[in-house]
């Protein structure tokens, strides 16, 4: 939908779309900007330019237009106080990790809190009406601007003011009146300073008019009136109209404080710490001039570097001032911003990694580390985390609860970054030789090798960071796209009655509603369909084998083998009870292991994915490192302790909003639940999840859980494979048998080694006797030595390194026509040793090199003595045969 076309139509009828009661009562005048043509509403009859192009743009820097001064946290208290006083419910922020939307990794706007996906539609579910929320939002498209422009953040607090007029809320008149009074009454801004600009919003098939409100060129908020759906000209009014007013809390603080940048009034005491580190006074005329120029020009140019050059020129900044003041200050702001974002994200369960949304988090931490390194700063990240959390904890108490988790994860990630620097340096040198990389190549270097463009710039591999780098990277890793499932001709069929959610009979009768090749649809079924990582039930229908069961929307489809019944026929159905029981135990075990992992490892543990079949199951969890044997044992012990305590496994249904408010968003371990009524499976307070799977009645029904294997399957994800119930007992039995077998093998091996050592000791004593026999031409084959005249070969396991050296050396020392070659095992290596007398005609070096090469190794020496070896034990027989033929002929 073309926003310009919508705006053109709406602006042609301002009384219908924009002219609210406040404008009439206060005497606002509608004007068209003399420069860009945009329509705006103002009380200043002399104003001819819109806020973007006005002469007063960013004039509040150094001279705030408010009668009161509030920093970041104080500004929220003022906003909250105003809206609560005006009959709004203040709602706590939602997580920045968007668990309730499968198309987003992070919460990008306050209205996202209340959006739920139902089929192909996005619906709104508000916990109160009207409400206000201090929603922390994460956006990564403008990372290159953070710290530089004075107003760009990677995370920011969107003040969400939301109302549904048709359900007891209010509409345009009240909304604009409230926002105007918030500015003028609560913050003491002169009413002549407030300007409203006409705009529109469109997305997700819906659209509506909006009014952006500005003070001295700074956009403080945007009131969106989501009212229509469909295409322009053919649109209809939504059943549920919604007010979506989003305002920037950081900007409210900035307008009241008038600091050179928004960063100066939003990070609290962390700024004092950082400014003290670099010895710069942030409240200086130079900084005010520079950042005012940046703010004025940033929206008029695509190239940030060009904006900076222009700001330097207009503010009269020297190269020395740029180097000693501006650049370090930009670094300080970047550190403060990125660290705050990481604190929120990790608190809410995200991990820095090289997959999904974790890309952006790792990128920010590496930017922090690179900035600290570049500026040669002595900073303790833990101290900075404490400063952030202590400043924010009154507004966001959850940050205080997770501060230690944040510290440990960032410490681990920073250590990995340091370890990777040697590799990064080698890669950077190659990049430098190759020439300036493209944006796509820079993205590849980061994704494949973890090399940030800041690092490449620091080591002079690139001269500038492309302004589009972070926006392109963000586009790749901001949302999760789901694959479409195959469709079947199921039109007109009713929803399948799900008996497995009722009495769950293992035998039942049902009517065949439709036959599609080897698949049938019944009017009701007890066969659980594949879903939520749980494999389907098997069994029989009308005597035919059920080999698969899938769910398509609300219709369950059964795939049969050997034939199908006729449409309209009533058939007897039987579920494989043993298979169902095993899968059910594995599913509840998955919940138990998830809870156990979280208790043992940390609060950042979330289910990444899961699979439950009848003979095995697996759970992939979000974790930063491979698991140690001790951690695995602790998780297994904790899981079996939950089984021993025989907790009841309760299933209850809640309205989705009620479930979220009651239990939080940790219920979405298995992903988004696209239904209004949510099925909650709870094991006391240990694990509470929204889940559609089959479960045991009590944890004791599982009897036993055994973790069979763990591995780190990708960065930030660890897989635990396990069995439960009868399969666990069978596994335990097999492990005991295997342990017994290994113990017996160890004893046998020990005895064999002991026997070999005894034989080797005896062999050493026999050296003089064997020498006499060989020199006398006697047969020594019974002693494991083959001879041809005075030429000898052995591959007997009774002879060790000592024997070969002494026997061979003494043999050729006594007879110059003699030669000796031995092949023997020495640990994991097979060795060859060759001695040859001067008149033997044997070249020791040639034999040793040849045999060693067969064994995949190398040999060395001269014609009289040589040795070598290799580790390819599969070639042992070939090596022995070749050595024997080379010396004996």
Swiss-Prot record:
HAMAP family: Ala_tRNA_synth_A. Residues 734-760, 866-889 are annotated as: Disordered. This is Alanine--tRNA ligase. Residues 872-881 have a biased composition (Basic and acidic residues). Its EC number is 6.1.1.7. Its main location: cytoplasm. One of its GO terms (molecular function) is aminoacyl-tRNA deacylase activity. It catalyses: tRNA(Ala) + L-alanine + ATP = L-alanyl-tRNA(Ala) + AMP + diphosphate. One of its GO terms (biological process) is alanyl-tRNA aminoacylation. It comes from the Archaea. Binds 1 zinc ion per subunit. Consists of three domains; the N-terminal catalytic domain, the editing domain and the C-terminal C-Ala domain. The editing domain removes incorrectly charged amino acids, while the C-Ala domain, along with tRNA(Ala), serves as a bridge to cooperatively bring together the editing and aminoacylation centers thus stimulating deacylation of misacylated tRNAs. It is found in: Cytoplasm. GO terms for cellular component: cytoplasm. Zn(2+) binds at residues 587, 591, 691, 695. Belongs to the class-II aminoacyl-tRNA synthetase family. NCBIfam families: A-tRNA_syn_arch, alaS. Its cofactor is Zn(2+).
